[in-house]
Amino acid sequence: MMNLGNRVKSVIKLTSTTGLTGKDFQATKVATFSTAQVQQAQENVRSYGGLKDKDRIFTNLYGEHDVYLKGAIARGDWYKTKNIIDKGKDWILKEMMASGLRGRGGAGFPSGLKWSFMPKTTSKDRPQYLVINADEGEPGTCKDREIMRHDPHKLIEGCLLAGFAMRACAAYIYIRGEFHYEAKVLEQAIDEAYKAGLIGENACGTGYKFDVYVHRGAGAYICGEETALIESIEGKQGKPRLKPPFPAMAGLYGCPTTVTNVETVAVAPTILRRGGAWFASFGRPKNAGTKLFCISGHVNNPCTVEEEMSIPLRELIDKHCGGVIGGWDNLKGVIPGGSSVPVLPKNICDNVLMDFDDLRQHRSGLGTAAVIVMNKETDMIAAIARLSKFYKHESCGQCTPCREGVGWLYDITDRLVTGNAKPDEIDSLEEISRQIEGHTICALGDAAAWPVQGLIRHFRPEIEDRIKQFQLNKKQSPF
């Protein structure tokens, strides 16, 4: 290492030959070092997206191959499932926690942790259940439908492994009532699994008894809420329960129950075969894995696609959908996670990453990863008003803030479409949304409030101009 005397001599020599003063030299040295740091940091930046075919979990997403048992086995489903079960419940839970998988139904709760909440002891008097939420009713969302339609055995095998890990005796797949074809495919796949001994009295030859049932819903969006779904299975009105007690303690028929999403369970077999570390290698920390994104709206090729978590929104749209109709500069806004999350304007969409944490930082959410793209031809006020109408219609009416407040949201946004409102009603609209948010038994109130909040946050000038134009037209009208 160069000693202090030599370092001083080197500095003096350099300044004498370059004509730099000591102060100028230090500034140059710092600037050079900073540039090198930036270049090194840029080299170390991990880019996300571009999932390779060998890493795709859903290999029949588009129904190009046989959806039933023979085709599923050829694609790797049910491969050494008995060996996975033989490794034990604790091993399965450990791998699921190591994978970093977060719930794919919208909330994003760590799945392995959720599965571990189930009691470790069982009794004949209080059996334990796994309930699959296949009541996919969120506007813009169509990922679970594709799984049930084209890859049903991934879901059934996932039910078996998840059920075993949480000591469940049966799984109830609660499917949306409108999904007639998907229910038929699923029931046929379940029959195949029973006949092959993959589920039933001696599932996969392990001695573990596990049954799978399909329960058809009746078209109510509110039944997508886990406790309302449980009420519906029990034959009651689909209205959310007060919590606690939580389903893990008192769920279906008063017994310990875990309610989880179709995609969450369907990816479990592949994770357990390839290892939690493999799944965790995709996406940013705490946003691990691959994800199904369903992209609709003003894109050239709407589609559902499996991609790596944390892929930039712009890359997702350009690569898989052929871009925005009219080009990226024609983009007005995107709802990134289904109708219940706030819309984002173009300037945020330019760089935002499609994962839980980055979207939360931008005051939106990943939700169900249903990407609704809107170009500049969109009347953003009318679009959000239409969502408010949906939530008004789907409210179960149990909570006053939701029953009354969501109706008020729609009444005001509907008038804002034409501009027939007072300027101070914009603030009133936001205040109503705040009074609904967080004041209801379930999250439907939040789901109704957030789109309105996003509209006001990012498109308030458009609302104000609409009101001004209405007032101007009113003054000019002879009537």
From Swiss-Prot:
Annotated keywords: 4Fe-4S, Electron transport, Flavoprotein, FMN, Iron, Iron-sulfur, Membrane, Metal-binding, Mitochondrion, Mitochondrion inner membrane, NAD, Oxidoreductase, Respiratory chain, Transit peptide, Translocase, Transport, Ubiquinone
Topology in the lipid bilayer: Peripheral membrane protein
Domain of life: Eukaryota
InterPro entries in UniProt: ComplexI_51kDa_subunit, NADH-UbQ_OxRdtase_51kDa_CS, NADH-UbQ_OxRdtase_suF, Nuo51_FMN-bd, Nuo51_FMN-bd_sf, Nuop51_4Fe4S-bd, Nuop51_4Fe4S-bd_sf, SLBB_dom
Cofactor binding comment, as recorded: Binds 1 FMN.
Entry binding sites for [4Fe-4S] cluster: 396, 399, 402, 442
Class in the EC hierarchy, top level: translocase
Positions annotated to bind FMN: 216-264
EC number: 7.1.1.2
GO biological process: mitochondrial electron transport, NADH to ubiquinone
Cytoplasm listed as a keyword: no
Transmembrane annotation, as ranges: none
GO molecular function, one term: FMN binding
Coiled coil: none
Subunit (UniProt): Complex I is composed of about 45 different subunits. This is a component of the flavoprotein-sulfur (FP) fragment of the enzyme.
UniProt similarity note: Belongs to the complex I 51 kDa subunit family.
Protein name: NADH dehydrogenase [ubiquinone] flavoprotein 1, mitochondrial
Species: Dictyostelium discoideum (Social amoeba)
Recorded name of the encoding gene: ndufv1
